[in-house]
Amino acid sequence: KIAIMPSPNNPTGNCFRPKDVEEILSRFNGIVVVDEAYAEYSDNPFVSRVEEFDNLVVLRTFSKAYAMAALRVGYAVSNKKLADMMICVKIPYSLNMISEGAAIAAVKDQDFVKRSVQMVREQRPILDSGLRKLGFETFPSDSNFILARSPIDHKVLVDGLKQRGVLIRDFGAKRRTENCIRTTVGTAEHNALLLEKAEEVISGCR
């Protein structure tokens, strides 16, 4: 049996509490996979604790903080016993040479990752505050995006922003994220543009 826990979660952006993950690890009779695709933006990664639990596997990716989504590079971290088991079932040649070379080069450029993550951490509360001032209900985020419930119809907002050259993700028709949108935390200039155009769309509905 395998239980998969995305932390930070997508699309909510929040992390599981460490004590909740620990409880699941201790009580679940199977392998617990914690997907930490967005972990660089959070404060509670579990990747350093794989030796504490005999049933923990942590997944990481180069698609987010390393900005290499097109190359489809990721990896798993676990204790040796689980790693040996995964190697037995891993498909051969799962990574091409171009992606492998790019990943090695990316690992050596930690300055880029640090700058990227720092920018998100600085801009995230600023964008969150700006959205709330426009009437959005924002959800706490440990990631590089913010989920927010729109003060107007989600389709009107998404379409209005698209007409103004701004693209956001629409989650408004999904269960439990009714009337919600998700926006990436960008640079100060990008975030200011989003807020400006969102205010235009919202004002046009009132």
Regions found by a protein language model. Name each.
Residues 78, 148-152, 185-187:
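Short beta-strand-to-loop capping motifs
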Residues 70, 142-143, 175-179:
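Short acidic/glycine-enriched loop/turn segments that link adjacent beta-strands
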Residues 120, 132-164:
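Conserved PLP-binding catalytic core of the aspartate aminotransferase-like
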Residues 2-6, 33, 75-77:
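Structural motif
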Residues 19, 163-164, 173-206:
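PLP-dependent enzyme catalytic core of the Aspartate aminotransferase-like
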